[in-house]
């Protein structure tokens, strides 16, 4: 198996009496951007946390290159992730935030300037991160994810807080990652962005896969991805206390 491949198989997880993941299975292959969509509470963020070894499951496996995250030899060189753009120390500059991560993960500090340029933070990287807009915090989080030059990227709602210029940049950035042969899993509520970014789409609801295919396959005979999504998720929206924010947002 290619070291970039994400393979999720039969994930089952409960939060109390609520079944959050119900036999969830899908694969993210190298050289593709896979869009991961579903209503609030569907299990998207929980699934990403399971893949990254942050949550346990009752059953099933989540593998990266054939191994669970906990058994990766150097996780940040193999997997980069953005789950929460607010996971930073606001009193640190963006640059010092990245340097701290690099040192703690035994990555070259020289990568800091490279990833800063990659995400377009410019001189803002010298300012305290607590003063960043959400879009800038997203860029900082992506820079952190890229420090290890990983072959696999997992990003939860990276378009959030982006202005039009930022959205255009993000499209090109994600497509560029896939063109380099990386496997990219991206969740998003902005369905209008996915046709310009994703090769493959996984739609989930109530912890189950509702559809899994290429954009062409999913939209065959329908006018848009939004139409497909609404058809599939009608009846799969259930706002549940404690689960609606995926437990972790």
Positions of PLM-derived features:
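Phosphate/oxyanion-binding loops and surfaces in catalytic or ligand/nucleic-acid-binding neighborhoods
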Residues: 104, 108, 231-236
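Conserved beta-strand-loop-alpha-helix hinge in the C-terminal portion
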Residues: 208-230
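ABC transporter nucleotide-binding domains
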Residues: 3-6, 13-186, 191-205, 210-211
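Active-site/binding-pocket entry motifs
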Residues: 88, 235-238
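ABC-family P-loop ATPase nucleotide-binding domain
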Residues: 1-12, 238-249
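A general boundary/transition motif marking the beginning of the first structured unit of a protein
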Residues: 89, 217-220, 241
């Amino acid at each position: 198996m290619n070291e970039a491949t994400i393979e999720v198989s039969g994930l089952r997880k409960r939060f109390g009496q609520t079944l959050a993941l119900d036999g969830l299975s899908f694969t993210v292959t190298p050289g593709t951007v896979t869009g991961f969509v579903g209503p609030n509470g569907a299990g998207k963020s929980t699934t990403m946390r399971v893949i990254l070894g942050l949550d346990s499951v009752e059953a099933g496996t989540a593998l990266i290159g054939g191994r669970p995250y906990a058994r990766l030899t150097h996780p940040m060189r193999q997997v980069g992730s953005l789950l929460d753009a607010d996971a930073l120390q606001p009193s640190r500059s963006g640059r010092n935030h990245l340097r701290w991560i690099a040192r703690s993960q035994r990555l070259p500090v020289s990568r800091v300037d490279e990833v800063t340029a990659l995400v377009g933070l410019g001189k803002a990287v010298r300012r305290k991160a607590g003063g960043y807009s959400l879009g800038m915090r997203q860029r900082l989080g992506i820079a952190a994810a890229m420090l290890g030059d990983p072959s696999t990227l997992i990003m939860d709602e990276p378009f959030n807080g982006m202005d039009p210029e930022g959205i255009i940049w993000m499209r090109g950035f994600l497509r560029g990652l896939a063109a380099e042969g990386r496997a990219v899993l991206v969740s998003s509520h902005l369905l209008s962005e996915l046709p310009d970014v994703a090769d493959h789409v996984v739609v989930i609801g109530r912890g189950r896969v509702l559809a899994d295919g290429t954009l062409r396959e999913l939209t065959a005979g329908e006018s848009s991805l939004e139409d497909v999504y609404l058809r599939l998720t009608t009846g799969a929206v259930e706002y549940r206390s404690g689960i609606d924010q995926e437990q972790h947002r």
